[in-house]
């Protein structure tokens, strides 16, 4: 019993210094990677690509009769659960933009598809930089992955919404106990969706192996921050509506930009947490060492990939 208590004390005594070292390293890593600058860049690209993405998504869903009206439900669900306050104004503006794209030619539609691919490509590049990945995926593989996201993604989302609507319509949910449990599940559904979306992003996008536990921690941090930021941002907009006095009818535009920027800050922060957990050997390094180790790691991975390519050609 005494040995067990001593082992727990030893673990606790080592836990505090490890946590301090981790948070110091994380802060230095955030500074080195200029997360705030990259979040602004991704927010700008997102605003340029959000209409093309919605257009591609809705056009794919419209090809399947079983997903009729799913596009409207999907837009409403996203606005209600993932865009805090002024969601109706943003929803109306996006609907007008998407409706106008229906007048475009096939060439214009092709450019919309390219713009949607650009957004996914930039997300891929930024996350791989956080993980110090130098060995890029082959162009064919990258294009196949982006194509799969743009085609299978809407189908899976539409299928999940259709399944949820079917379950909701079942008479079995008239039971008070089951109905209460289902309502509780729906209340936690946005957080669960955020968690699994972040987890998939941190596990699948980097072109290197990421431990599931590290990805789960980063995804949990990002999902919790995302839910808290929704409530905080909505509170700020409703309690301090000075932006409406300045921008008037155009107030939805800066609101959307600030919200998208905040979302990318959270996404990149969760990615930094995930990547830092896998670099425990560097937790004691200073900022200069972080910079040099990052550059050397990228150089080593690049030389290893070139060596493997040479050996394959031989």
Swiss-Prot record:
It comes from the Bacteria. The lineage of its organism: Bacteria, Pseudomonadati, Pseudomonadota, Gammaproteobacteria, Vibrionales. The keyword Lipoprotein does not apply. It is a multi-pass membrane protein. It comes from Vibrio parahaemolyticus serotype O3:K6 (strain RIMD 2210633). It is found in: Cell inner membrane. This is UPF0761 membrane protein VP0125. Coiled coil: none annotated. The keyword Lipid biosynthesis does not apply. Pfam families: Virul_fac_BrkB (PF03631). GO terms for cellular component: plasma membrane. Its main location: membrane. Residues 295-314 are annotated as: Disordered. Belongs to the UPF0761 family. Keywords: Cell inner membrane, Cell membrane, Membrane, Transmembrane, Transmembrane helix. The chain crosses the membrane at residues 41-61, 104-124, 139-159, 185-205, 217-237, 249-269.
């Amino acid at each position: 019993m005494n040995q067990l208590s001593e082992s727990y004390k030893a673990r606790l005594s080592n836990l505090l210094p490890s946590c301090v070292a981790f948070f110091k390293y994380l802060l230095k890593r955030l500074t080195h990677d200029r997360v705030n600058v990259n979040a602004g860049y991704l927010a700008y690209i997102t605003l340029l690509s959000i209409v093309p993405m919605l257009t591609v998504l809705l056009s794919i869903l419209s090809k399947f009769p079983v997903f009729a009206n799913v596009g409207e439900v999907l837009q409403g669900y996203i606005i209600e659960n993932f865009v805090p306050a002024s969601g109706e104004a943003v929803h109306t503006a996006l609907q007008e933009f998407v409706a106008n794209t229906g007048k475009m030619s096939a060439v214009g539609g092709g450019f919309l598809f390219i713009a949607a691919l650009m957004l996914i490509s930039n997300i891929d590049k930024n996350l791989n930089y956080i993980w110090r990945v130098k060995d890029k995926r082959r162009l064919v593989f990258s294009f196949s992955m982006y194509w799969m996201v743009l085609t299978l993604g809407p189908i899976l989302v539409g299928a999940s919404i259709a399944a949820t609507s079917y379950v909701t319509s079942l008479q079995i949910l008239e039971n008070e106990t089951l109905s209460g449990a289902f309502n509780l599940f729906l209340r936690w559904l946005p957080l669960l969706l955020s968690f699994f979306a972040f987890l998939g992003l941190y596990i699948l996008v980097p072109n290197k192996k990421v431990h599931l536990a590290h990805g789960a921690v980063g995804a949990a941090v990002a999902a919790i921050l995302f839910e808290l930021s929704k409530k905080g941002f909505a509170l700020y907009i409703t309690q301090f509506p000075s932006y409406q006095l300045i921008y008037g009818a155009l107030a939805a535009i800066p609101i959307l930009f600030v919200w998208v920027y905040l979302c990318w800050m959270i996404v990149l922060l969760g990615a930094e947490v995930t990547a830092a957990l896998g670099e425990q050997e560097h937790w004691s390094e200073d900022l200069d060492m972080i910079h040099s180790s990052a550059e050397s790691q990228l150089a080593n991975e690049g030389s290893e990939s070139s060596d493997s390519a040479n050996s394959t050609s031989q």
